[in-house]
Amino acid sequence: MSELTKTEKRAVILLSGGLDSATVVAMARAEGYVCYTMSFDYGQRHRAELDAAARVAGDLGAVEHKVIGLNLNGIGGSALTDSSIAVPESPSEGIPVTYVPARNTVFLSLALGWAEVLGARDIFIGVNAVDYSGYPDCRPEFVESFERMANLATKAGVEGQGFTIRAPLQNLSKSDIVKAGTALGVDYSLTVSCYQADDQGRACGKCDSCRLRAEGFTAAGIADPTRYF
């Protein structure tokens, strides 16, 4: 192992291919991290996000982009993994049916495993608790609790080489996220946020994710490159 490899600052970054996670990759890169990105083919209906994730990883200089296959549609329970459940096209009360049971817990666990193998001590996730859909696994207390678990459940953690779960977007509005990413050179035309995106990555313009994205660009005063079908 070279001296550079020994001393480089590595991070594993969960990259869905959407606006938030693309911004997080740019933020980590700006902090000097060598970026390893991880996406999941979990049976989601909006599979165009996987192509978007690969584009973003390449554009932002990730040294490795890994796609993990999971069969969360075998569990179901979400409009994103069960085609018999419609994606809502208007805001609803409570936790919406687009919540995927335990998704961020599963994703962070696999990112944690890869981070331990790589010798990375920082794991980035693009969760947000301001302009968001109300998912329980996007809240600060979830991130803090997972970090405690990570340091109890791993060889590196119990040997004192602790992990940090970084959620730099946690308290930002969607417009602040758009502004930050734009300043860091994120090409948002490469991203896909829509829960019902077609194979070409074109958005429905009606789902909660589309609404939050459009409102963010409008509030930021930045042109929205989203393509619609």
From Swiss-Prot:
Gene3D superfamilies reported in the protein's UniProt record: HUPs
Cofactor dependency: Zn(2+)
Coiled coil: none
Residue numbers binding ATP: L15, S16, G17, G18, L19, D20, S21, A22, T23, V24, V25
Pathway assigned to this chain's UniProt record: Purine metabolism; 7-cyano-7-deazaguanine biosynthesis
Domain of life: Bacteria
Keywords: ATP-binding, Ligase, Metal-binding, Nucleotide-binding, Queuosine biosynthesis, Zinc
Residues that coordinate or bind Zn(2+): C194, C204, C207, C210
Cited function: Catalyzes the ATP-dependent conversion of 7-carboxy-7-deazaguanine (CDG) to 7-cyano-7-deazaguanine (preQ(0)).
Protein name: 7-cyano-7-deazaguanine synthase
UniProt source species: Pseudomonas syringae pv. syringae (strain B728a)
Underlying gene: queC
